[in-house]
Amino acid sequence: MERVWWKEAVVYQIYPRSFYDSNGDGIGDIRGIIAKLDYLKELGVDVVWLSPVYKSPNDDNGYDISDYRDIMDEFGTMADWKTMLEEMHKRGIKLVMDLVVNHTSDEHPWFIESRKSKDNPYRDYYIWRPGKNGKEPNNWESVFSGSAWEYDEMTGEYYLHLFSKKQPDLNWENPKVRREVYEMMKFWLDKGVDGFRMDVINMISKVPELPDGEPQSGKKYASGSRYYMNGPRVHEFLQEMNREVLSKYDIMTVGETPGVTPKEGILYTDPSRRELNMVFQFEHMDLDSGPGGKWDIRPWSLADLKKTMTKWQKELEGKGWNSLYLNNHDQPRAVSRFGDDGKYRVESAKMLATFLHMMQGTPYIYQGEEIGMTNVRFPSIEDYRDIETLNMYKERVEEYGEDPQEVMEKIYYKGRDNARTPMQWDDSENAGFTAGTPWIPVNPNYKEINVKAALEDPNSVFHYYKKLIQLRKQHDIIVYGTYDLILEDDPYIYRYTRTLGNEQLIVITNFSEKTPVFRLPDHIIYKTKELLISNYDVDEAEELKEIRLRPWEARVYKIRLP
């Protein structure tokens, strides 16, 4: 068993705009993060993944970067950033920065030059094409709705933007672009950064011919994802990046890779291939999406969740490494999506944490998850800020004539602003996030759900997360044990084991408010048992043979095999 620090770590994601505002302008900032580092130390996390703080016009909340080597004014200064890094390192917390290199902002100096003329030295830093028959070069749809192409009058050509029109895609076929990216990465690593989370990194290689996507009935544009996800040169580029940059530092890397299968996941994460340490796969995040994509909402089933999680656990075992997550800045709140955010909010938040943190992989906690923050239902589209949500609403209501209330229901369930409402620190005005007017409204349930209340209550979701993190430090089996699913067909109970030598964890989670009976399979015989954690009071003497589970109950036993 080779010990690796990033396998043993727990990562906490900070979305800086919504974390804590130190100066009253309504926007979270770097000094706000510094002010709350003792809170993260108390929770026990090892790594912070910081969403982008680079200079940006903020079209997509910092994922549109105009200067990779400077800090956004709203967030502070480079001096603030250095102080934050020092204060994190003092507390034994590492810093992973967001690396956004599929695209830049259209206000980046490279793009400003690129659009000036067809023979500008920066022209082929981006993907420019002439139109076809007076229309876009192909029929690709942007992830944020509408065409993925924008016409530019200056040279009479179109540029590709898989995201917003203010996020032109970089041309990774150009070795100069790659060199610029690697130099920028070294700039941050030499300042002491401990790794990168790489935004949509599996989209950097496009099929050079940029063919049309499969047309969708009733839609003007088509998905071109098969021509830009896991493209022809993506592994070549990542191996080059590893050779030139990553291999020279002791860091952790995680790639965001929508649409990746376990077989592809291994190509990115098998250590012998020298690319990335782990990826964020999306299969479990797509279980409630139909063929029409994210906004085509379907009920998810526990059977599908078991199948998906088990597939990733088993297929990467001994080859790659999993990232474990249910929440991030792009997803709705897990307790509202997979649990019960009403009567059983606390129980189901703890159950979901148990289910996730006991699997093999590196767990990620998104800010507010550790206190059981929930989705929000703002009354009006005017209360929303996310470009993806606003573009989708406009397209569906204005162009397709859909019922505005039905579109709002989709946003309430799946919108990214569910994750972006301000962190709920206490029950004072604006949840203690800001002394000013918050950039996005606060979830009205902050009076009940907040950090202050969580710290004071020994049975809170926070203290449960803290215990899960401590257990990870005490038991190698949680990090390195192999995973096996038991009870594949049970509609309510997700039960699996982890095994290392003659030790085994039995993880029992009830994904319902029903009270199903758990029975220990006859083939499991043990010498001793110990209850490691549970979200209800449990009689330690209770036999494992047959247990009636309570709503959203979770238990983890450690047994010694004969």
From Swiss-Prot:
Q: What is its main location?
A: cytoplasm
Residue(s) at site: Transition state stabilizer: 330
Annotated Gene3D superfamilies:
Glycosidases, Golgi alpha-mannosidase II, Oligo-1,6-glucosidase, Domain 2
UniProt keyword annotation of Mitochondrion present = no
Q: Which reaction does it catalyse?
A: Hydrolysis of (1->6)-alpha-D-glucosidic linkages in some oligosaccharides produced from starch and glycogen by alpha-amylase, and in isomaltose
Residue positions of the active site: 199, 256
Biological process annotations from GO? oligosaccharide catabolic process
CC terms in the record's Gene Ontology section:
cytoplasm
- Domain of life where this protein originates: Bacteria
Q: Which residues form the signal peptide?
A: none
Q: Which family does it belong to?
A: Belongs to the glycosyl hydrolase 13 family.
NCBIfam families given in the database record: PRK10933.1
Q: What is this protein called?
A: Oligo-1,6-glucosidase
What gene is behind this protein? malL
